[in-house]
Amino acid sequence: MKMIRVVGFAASAAALFAVSPATAHAQAKLDDPTIVAIFDAANTWDIQTGELAAKNGSTKEIRDFGAMLARDHKNVRQQGRDLAKKLGVTPTPPKDFAMAKDHDAAVKSLRAASSKAFDRAFLEHEVAFHKAVLDAVTKTLLPALKNQEARALVTKVAPAFQAHMVAAQNLLDKQIAAR
Protein backbone atom coordinates (compact mmCIF):
# COMPACT_ATOMS: atom_id res chain seq x y z
CA MET A 1 0.00 0.00 0.00
CA LYS A 2 2.78 2.43 0.91
CA MET A 3 4.64 1.67 -2.30
CA ILE A 4 1.52 2.33 -4.34
CA ARG A 5 1.34 5.90 -3.01
CA VAL A 6 4.96 6.63 -3.88
CA VAL A 7 4.64 5.15 -7.35
CA GLY A 8 1.26 6.86 -7.70
CA PHE A 9 2.92 10.22 -7.16
CA ALA A 10 5.46 9.50 -9.86
CA ALA A 11 2.72 8.38 -12.23
CA SER A 12 0.77 11.55 -11.50
CA ALA A 13 3.85 13.64 -12.18
CA ALA A 14 4.47 11.82 -15.43
CA ALA A 15 0.84 12.24 -16.48
CA LEU A 16 0.80 15.97 -15.75
CA PHE A 17 4.10 16.56 -17.48
CA ALA A 18 3.52 14.25 -20.44
CA VAL A 19 0.87 16.44 -22.04
CA SER A 20 1.76 18.44 -25.09
CA PRO A 21 2.44 22.17 -24.66
CA ALA A 22 -0.83 23.06 -26.40
CA THR A 23 -2.84 20.72 -24.20
CA ALA A 24 -1.02 21.79 -21.07
CA HIS A 25 -1.65 25.44 -21.89
CA ALA A 26 -5.33 24.78 -22.36
CA GLN A 27 -5.56 22.69 -19.19
CA ALA A 28 -3.30 24.58 -16.83
CA LYS A 29 -2.57 27.96 -18.46
CA LEU A 30 1.07 27.07 -18.84
CA ASP A 31 2.60 30.53 -18.85
CA ASP A 32 5.89 31.68 -17.34
CA PRO A 33 4.47 32.36 -13.83
CA THR A 34 2.91 28.87 -13.79
CA ILE A 35 6.14 27.26 -14.99
CA VAL A 36 8.11 29.14 -12.32
CA ALA A 37 5.67 27.80 -9.70
CA ILE A 38 6.04 24.24 -11.01
CA PHE A 39 9.85 24.63 -11.01
CA ASP A 40 9.74 25.88 -7.41
CA ALA A 41 7.41 23.10 -6.30
CA ALA A 42 9.50 20.36 -7.91
CA ASN A 43 12.58 21.60 -6.08
CA THR A 44 10.71 22.01 -2.79
CA TRP A 45 9.36 18.47 -3.04
CA ASP A 46 12.80 17.00 -3.59
CA ILE A 47 14.18 19.04 -0.71
CA GLN A 48 11.52 17.43 1.48
CA THR A 49 12.17 13.88 0.30
CA GLY A 50 15.93 14.42 0.42
CA GLU A 51 15.76 15.67 4.00
CA LEU A 52 13.57 12.71 4.90
CA ALA A 53 16.16 10.32 3.44
CA ALA A 54 18.98 12.16 5.22
CA LYS A 55 17.14 11.47 8.46
CA ASN A 56 15.52 8.07 7.84
CA GLY A 57 17.85 6.28 5.43
CA SER A 58 19.11 2.97 6.78
CA THR A 59 22.62 3.41 5.37
CA LYS A 60 25.11 6.24 5.27
CA GLU A 61 24.98 6.07 1.48
CA ILE A 62 21.22 6.76 1.42
CA ARG A 63 21.49 9.46 4.09
CA ASP A 64 24.32 11.16 2.18
CA PHE A 65 22.39 10.95 -1.10
CA GLY A 66 19.33 12.48 0.57
CA ALA A 67 21.42 15.30 2.05
CA MET A 68 22.99 15.98 -1.35
CA LEU A 69 19.56 16.11 -3.01
CA ALA A 70 18.26 18.54 -0.40
CA ARG A 71 21.35 20.75 -0.71
CA ASP A 72 21.31 20.77 -4.52
CA HIS A 73 17.59 21.46 -4.79
CA LYS A 74 17.75 24.25 -2.19
CA ASN A 75 20.40 25.91 -4.34
CA VAL A 76 18.40 25.49 -7.56
CA ARG A 77 15.16 26.61 -5.91
CA GLN A 78 16.89 29.75 -4.65
CA GLN A 79 18.25 30.48 -8.12
CA GLY A 80 14.71 30.20 -9.47
CA ARG A 81 13.30 32.46 -6.75
CA ASP A 82 16.05 35.02 -7.28
CA LEU A 83 15.38 35.05 -11.02
CA ALA A 84 11.62 35.34 -10.50
CA LYS A 85 12.21 38.32 -8.20
CA LYS A 86 14.60 39.94 -10.68
CA LEU A 87 12.06 39.50 -13.49
CA GLY A 88 9.11 40.58 -11.37
CA VAL A 89 7.39 37.23 -11.93
CA THR A 90 5.01 36.02 -9.24
CA PRO A 91 4.87 32.20 -9.28
CA THR A 92 1.29 31.11 -9.91
CA PRO A 93 0.60 27.40 -9.33
CA PRO A 94 -1.92 25.72 -11.62
CA LYS A 95 -5.47 25.96 -10.25
CA ASP A 96 -5.79 22.20 -9.90
CA PHE A 97 -2.29 21.24 -8.80
CA ALA A 98 -3.06 17.58 -8.06
CA MET A 99 0.64 16.82 -7.88
CA ALA A 100 0.82 18.68 -4.56
CA LYS A 101 -1.69 16.25 -3.02
CA ASP A 102 0.12 13.32 -4.60
CA HIS A 103 3.42 14.56 -3.18
CA ASP A 104 1.89 14.80 0.28
CA ALA A 105 0.67 11.20 -0.03
CA ALA A 106 4.11 10.05 -1.22
CA VAL A 107 5.83 11.76 1.72
CA LYS A 108 3.32 10.26 4.14
CA SER A 109 4.04 6.83 2.66
CA LEU A 110 7.80 7.35 2.91
CA ARG A 111 7.49 8.50 6.52
CA ALA A 112 5.60 5.32 7.37
CA ALA A 113 8.23 3.07 5.76
CA SER A 114 11.11 1.82 7.83
CA SER A 115 14.70 0.80 7.25
CA LYS A 116 15.43 -0.92 3.94
CA ALA A 117 11.79 -0.61 2.84
CA PHE A 118 12.23 3.15 3.17
CA ASP A 119 15.45 3.09 1.18
CA ARG A 120 13.93 1.19 -1.72
CA ALA A 121 10.71 3.25 -1.79
CA PHE A 122 12.74 6.46 -1.62
CA LEU A 123 15.06 5.43 -4.46
CA GLU A 124 12.19 4.24 -6.66
CA HIS A 125 10.44 7.54 -5.99
CA GLU A 126 13.54 9.54 -6.87
CA VAL A 127 14.11 7.70 -10.15
CA ALA A 128 10.49 8.15 -11.23
CA PHE A 129 10.29 11.74 -9.98
CA HIS A 130 13.44 12.89 -11.76
CA LYS A 131 12.42 11.09 -14.94
CA ALA A 132 9.04 12.84 -14.87
CA VAL A 133 10.67 16.23 -14.26
CA LEU A 134 13.16 15.72 -17.08
CA ASP A 135 10.37 14.67 -19.44
CA ALA A 136 8.40 17.75 -18.41
CA VAL A 137 11.34 20.04 -18.96
CA THR A 138 12.09 18.79 -22.45
CA LYS A 139 8.58 18.14 -23.72
CA THR A 140 6.42 20.73 -21.99
CA LEU A 141 8.09 23.38 -19.85
CA LEU A 142 10.97 24.54 -22.06
CA PRO A 143 8.80 24.75 -25.19
CA ALA A 144 6.26 26.85 -23.26
CA LEU A 145 8.74 29.17 -21.48
CA LYS A 146 8.90 32.58 -23.11
CA ASN A 147 11.49 34.33 -20.94
CA GLN A 148 15.02 33.58 -22.15
CA GLU A 149 16.64 33.93 -18.70
CA ALA A 150 14.18 31.43 -17.25
CA ARG A 151 14.84 29.09 -20.19
CA ALA A 152 18.57 29.43 -19.58
CA LEU A 153 18.21 28.55 -15.89
CA VAL A 154 16.03 25.50 -16.56
CA THR A 155 18.44 24.37 -19.28
CA LYS A 156 21.44 24.91 -16.98
CA VAL A 157 20.05 22.81 -14.12
CA ALA A 158 18.59 19.96 -16.21
CA PRO A 159 21.90 18.01 -16.19
CA ALA A 160 21.83 17.99 -12.37
CA PHE A 161 18.33 16.47 -12.47
CA GLN A 162 19.70 13.85 -14.86
CA ALA A 163 22.63 13.16 -12.53
CA HIS A 164 20.27 12.76 -9.57
CA MET A 165 18.15 10.28 -11.53
CA VAL A 166 21.21 8.24 -12.55
CA ALA A 167 22.60 8.26 -9.01
CA ALA A 168 19.26 7.11 -7.59
CA GLN A 169 19.03 4.36 -10.20
CA ASN A 170 22.59 3.23 -9.43
CA LEU A 171 21.84 3.07 -5.71
CA LEU A 172 18.62 1.19 -6.41
CA ASP A 173 20.41 -1.28 -8.69
CA LYS A 174 23.07 -1.81 -6.02
CA GLN A 175 20.39 -2.41 -3.40
CA ILE A 176 18.55 -4.91 -5.63
CA ALA A 177 21.79 -6.76 -6.45
CA ALA A 178 22.59 -7.09 -2.75
CA ARG A 179 19.38 -9.04 -2.09
Language-model features: locations:
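His/Met- and acidic-residue-enriched segments that coordinate or traffic transition-metal cofactors
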Residues: 2-9, 17-179
